[in-house]
Amino acid sequence: MKIILKTLSALLSASGESSAHIDADVKYDKYGFPYIQAKTFKGLLRESGLEVCEILGKDYKVVDDLFGKTGNKDSGILAFNNLCLKDFNAIEQELKGQGNILNIEFVKKFFTEIRQQTTIENGTAKDKSLRKYRLIKEGIEFETNIENVPPSQTEFLKFTLLNLRYIGTRRNRGFGKIEIKPVIDQLSTSSNPTAQSSINSTNNVNPLAKLSFEITTMDTLLIAKIFGEQNTVSTEKYIPAQNIRGLIAGMIIKNRNLVNVAHKDAVFKEIILAEKIKFNNAFIKGTQPVPKIYGYDKTDPDSKAEFIFEQQKPMKAMSGFAEFSNAEVKMEEVETTFSFHNSRSDNRLAGRSTKDEGAIFYYEGIAPAQTFESELIGSKSDLNYILPLLEQNGGIHRMGKSKSAQYSKVKFDRIKLAEIKPEILPESKSPVYIVFQSPVITYNEFGTAIPDVSRLQNELVTYIKKLTKISIASSSDTIENYMGVWQSKTPREMAFDIGTTLKIEFEGVLENKILTEMEMAGLGERKAEGYGRISLMNLTDGLVRKNSNNNSNVQVTVPLNPFTNPTLTSIFNNQTAQDELNRLKLKAIGNAAHHYNKLPNSLISKLKESLTNASLKSNWDSFISDIKGKKAHKTLDDANLWESVSQLEVPKDVLNYNSFPTQKLYWLAYFKALRAKQIKPEKNGK
């Protein structure tokens, strides 16, 4: 169901963020365009649904079914997306092709306004009560789609939307009045491809293959990780194999109607429970985890990436993700964003979180419009079953935390299935380097997960018979998963972290076949879940370190409007006019410097007041006629300003220098600069 929301008054859709100048700010994207968070909207709509139930005499169960029950992990049937500006998809596509032409601060000003408020106490402003808010302007339209609306509840949801008339902070103080227009979708038959009902193998020939794909974040993506900060949920900077595996498992269960009996299904066993398919993490496109063997000299920020083994100088370890090429390591940053949320108390009459009830919390997420890539390795028939599942719904799926609102929407694209052809590679000499591409779990004799190099060595000697030495550069991580069937988290376990590097030394040479088998098998436990993935890399010492070029904050100046979208055209024209105005004022201030202390303050104030009140050039001409031949005329003439002031002359390199509005702006800035510079110091020197 598509909905259009229009602000009928200024809206404070507070993000929980503030700055030195703004106490409560709205939520906006990297371009400066405001949006309303889906999680916030869902909570408000749920409250409206309860009111509709009371009006119509319905049971609250319909609200719990649609929106989920408070305090329950079940998120309900409906799925919500952020409310973005109307036609934002077209706006975003045009912006992507035009670089950073628009100033982010000007975009904010185009859609928002700043207001100040204070508290009055005993007839005067209360101490420290001044607050400054950024508000979304009246008349701004937003739109979104509510997904998975049951046809039987369309009418109820429509009433719920129409009943919602105020949103945002301080909505009982005149802010946040809105109008919502639901657009009821026509029912249509889905054309999404359906996975085959069984896994076929022709003539028992089932070659090894890989299914590669890209995952692009359409909304903020939250892959929750264990982090010690209270009221904050942090995210991983990659998409774990466990989430990809869980998504595919969920689709198989749904398509084959396997609720509560999935473990008995042959297809589910083959793809999910057996260790026949290797699920890999999805890293930011073109990168891989930085091997922990690399570090750089702490005393020299521009030093090269060097092996940390046997270094005498102080080294700083490297981490994150990077692209390796041409003796260089290019670090890539995964962009994240923070969002503020609050949960209301059970007391609906309170209307907000109270001191004793409710809570506030922050979600960190991977920002939208970032592309990750991964691949699955397994038999061609198994992967051929998975391929149409990923293509369903145009490749758009939900994964991660808070899937029903704001977070989790991703798009699978560039999905390709190809057989793995055997490569004839030369034998490898000692040493070889193994870099962990996922957490690697090892169990001790009591079944407790403890990172243990000796356990890894026991596995490695089955492949490398003449192993002589293992050196390791590592850190540990704590892993935890969520089991939807159990509605609870799995026990926490310690593991070797991603990027952990093993330097393997041995006698003689190793056949490529052995290395390939070891890479395919992985190391450690729980490999069927996506853990234990490794990569054999040819690492070299002394790489040049570079950072990805991120010029997103550098504004590009262009003389002509490059946009066709009406909203972008309007913003560009206003920004250009404002830029021209700023240049005009700067030119006036610069020229005023030649006449400091040439005119008395009283005359400057008189000129400024008369020009301010003049709505037409003829009004100013009339004022000039009145002072002609008087003392003001002589003072201006002595300062060599009479001709310029009387004619309101503007430098000819200024756009529209002959128009009265331009002349007025220039000379008002000129007089203001003169007056400001002529303020004489007090006797005490201040």
Over which residues does each language-model region extend?
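Conserved active-site/ligand-binding neighborhood in enzyme cores
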Residues: M1-K686
